[in-house]
């Protein structure tokens, strides 16, 4: 027991000791932490300012101290004695504030302590500013990228639009689909336009050699031949059907050239056929553009009408005879075109379906009607009226739609009983309509028909084709055309609308029943309707932009049609405008220098024809200047633009610098050859004063640019032959100087302007010699050339000969010719070789020659340094040759003395005219003269 108690007591003792140890350890830990904190606690509070904060605090303290100080008193007295106001000076000094780049980064320390959340907001602002900077940089990069890409895009925009226009062509259009877009198929008939009609015309170019064309009034000579021919002719062979912009433009340019050839010859030109043949060749994927030429040919018969026949249209009112003639041609031509198109479509569908083509029109249309509405042994349209397996109203409508009115009348006669059952008075209506379909029915019949039509509309449904026929016969509700089962294509819609149009012939209309002209649906109202619909109505799928163009043509809106087509097909639009201007179909406006092709005036629109041509010419690059002239010559097709064409021709001539091509070249008999401008005077009517101003302006510009060949031609045309020789002198002088003082190379300077005309292609010395010979052979023209210029030119020609002899190392001949020129005093005779006696008279002679030197022309003076160099070099070479002879006799010694004398004279003379010589020449002459001693 005791042992057990002892054990328990021992355990308790050990537990108490353990708890004491643990408490002491915890106390020590707590005390040590407290001691650590006491030791680390600073005696002064920790400064919570950074360096920038300390700097700002110091500035604040400094400002407070400065406010309490009044400065040094002695300094005040000292400054006052010197006349300075200390207070004002101090204010001026403290008013100066030098901005530090770190000022904007200083923070308000007080607000930072008082408002701790401000720091968070500032951080957010920094992040936001970084994000904004990043976004702005990205935006600027995108703009720069788009701009750089846009440069290349603008350069190829036209060609791209041409390719896009091809891709927009519908690939799945059917002849009679549900879409309202026009679907003109390549297989459709295109009468009046054949390639043979173009190929049969002469293909000889105005630029061909030997082309016999009559010379227009104002031309100086007959045609000698022109060397340039259009690079791409209309009949050239092509290996591909896909034409780019350049190929297309060159083909149309050839056609425009043929048009101008016909105009110059005063011959008629079949413009529609001419341009259509090009369109058929280059627009194989956009066949509607070719169909547009066919449509225009139906409107304006090119075999009947000629250039400017409808010119009065744009000057007259809409009720004038010229305007009414165009309106009538538009209606009748468009209807004929659409009817022929539909008839060809019938043949195409029957052929595709394997039907045997029949000559009988009625049987053909019946077969086509069954092909459309008879499927799998039953009629697919329950509203179609079928009698004896023949859909009467369908067949009759299609006969009318295809323009076969005689066949339609025969069909009504054949089925008259059946038609009477379906419409009691219908045969009577149709017989009256067939007599003159362009006029309304007599009033009595028209009232009866319109009453039946009202009942037909009231108790619908009826056969939709019967509805359409009644609507056409009675001219019922022409402003409302809602026949979706009949007008399945835009062609159908335009055909019905055009059938409603009537020409406002008041006397004819009133005598046939008194129908008011105000109730007629005329072409003007159709124009407004089509324009109000806009292109989206005729091109809902955005795949055939030419549909709206064709619709505008059909209603006579030629100006809007050209402007709309120009967006996607600028090449075709330009040539459509040229062809229309040929016949006078365009309403134009006085030329204004703006970029608007279409100009709106109240309810009318007019086209800026010159601007259209200029816009097209801007797209042409690397083409012959004659191509530009061809298009400029088309501008006077509108007579009001003759002055504009003259100004554009001046600009073309002055910028192209091809004066010999346009104005002719000089022939050996001093006359000139015929230029292109002579041939085009019938098209671009330059008068004599305008030509003289053009010659003078071009000559001055050529002088400034250093184009001596052009300058010579233009001054020759002006009749200023003395100036011609003066220009030749200047040209020859510069050629001599450009060869250099130390070189005998006869190559022309690289800095000289090169002209493409015949005059400038000759060497300057040959040109000058030819001009001098030509004028001297003609006494009248020679009298107009001054003797001074003749003498100067002859002197320069001899200098050229001196250079050639010098290059051949013919030293004796060089010195003899220089002595003959008498420009340098090396031919002074030495009577006695006594220097002391001869110096005074020789010195006097040299002074006299130096005085004469100042009277020379500048062109002659400029070659003197080169001539002095050649003289001294020849003297030196000849002196060395004689000195190296094995035996030097008395005659050789005299030659050496004469050479020494010539060298001395040359050096003495150079010192008298040293102001006109370069230091290099003077040093060379003096150095070489020493070698002769």
UniProtKB/Swiss-Prot annotation:
Residues 1-10 have a biased composition (Basic and acidic residues). The lineage of its organism: Eukaryota, Fungi, Dikarya, Ascomycota, Taphrinomycotina. Keywords: mRNA transport, Nuclear pore complex, Nucleus, Phosphoprotein, Protein transport, Translocation, Transport. It comes from Schizosaccharomyces pombe (strain 972 / ATCC 24843). This is Nucleoporin npp106. The modification Phosphothreonine is found at residues 217, 221. Has a role in promoting mRNA export from the nucleus. Homodimer. It is found in: Nucleus, Nuclear pore complex. GO terms for molecular function: structural constituent of nuclear pore. One of its GO terms (cellular component) is cytosol.
